Amino acid sequence: MKKKTKVLQELIHDGKCHLRPLVAIPLQAQMAEALGYEVVGISGAYTAAHILGMPDAGLITMTEMVENAKRVCDATTIPVIADGDTGFGNAINVRRTVKEMIQAGAAAIFLEDQVAPKRCGFVKGKEVIPLEEAVGKIRAAVDVRNELDPDFVIMARTDARTAVGGSLDEVIRRAQAFEAIGADIIYVEAVQGRDEVKKVRKSIKCALAASAWDMKPYPTLKEFTDLGLCLTLGVMFFEAGLIADYEMLKNMKEKGLEYWYEWREKAQSHPASWQRIYDMVGFPKVREWEEKYLPKEQLDKYDKSGGLYEPR
């Protein structure tokens, strides 16, 4: 089997833009893989909200992000792009962050040029560090990549477009500097329209990714490809799940437990029903291992016990 880093290198250089859903938990990555997605990203914002109940404001630690990344990477065979925030310190800290993410099994990391504490790229109040300091951080990341796995993908993100004092010229200046020291992908946050994407694309030769929140109407995947992008950014599909959670809780509160029972009966055949989720996370594999490794008499438990689900 090819290394995940090698697979991702091939994806970002195949001339197509790939849809990259953002996840925070292993099960979401497993769902994405089961549905045929080729790559997933870990959202720092969603991870902070999911495991801490806190905003994406520089409050989550490197250890928490790495531990979560390892769980996601272990659960899927497709490449995972990890969120490295600002590297959790200066260029020296970046070295350790990149090393830890490589050891966790990530295929890539993106590092941004915001000041610390940083904030979600969609939130007002962003500031960026001086270019020289940002270059030092990306250089540190590239050095660790070259030492440990030359195929590991370094995605250098700049928030300079909508940060205090930001401009497209500053975005291009930073993109060119990051490319010159070995970044594999330039990631531009909050690019303001298709014309700006085209200008950035013409200014660099390496792979390019850009968020689409300020591009109206929103581009199709084909248009992203035509614009020369290699990955979509910020496909936060988990919003749909959170809305569904909210509606379920609201309806149970207002209509009682009967609402849950009725909904549950209708959901039995859905590909994401709890029985199918048990299949997805590996109960059948556990039974396969039991049959391979355990004494035969211990397998009688399946015939001598009851339950709503039997792994097969």
Language model: regions and residue ranges:
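Gly/Pro-rich interdomain helix-loop hinge
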Residues: 269-283
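A residue-identity detector for tryptophan
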Residues: 213, 260-263, 274, 289
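Alpha/beta enzyme core
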Residues: 2-210, 214-233, 240, 247, ...
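A general boundary/transition motif marking the beginning of the first structured unit of a protein
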Residues: 129, 237, 277-281
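Short, isolated positions within intrinsically disordered regulatory regions of eukaryotic proteins
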Residues: 182, 264-267, 278, 293
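Intrinsically disordered, low-complexity regions enriched in Ser/Pro/Gly/Gln/His and often acidic
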Residues: 178, 253-256, 282
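Shared catalytic-loop signature of beta/alpha-barrel
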Residues: 227-272
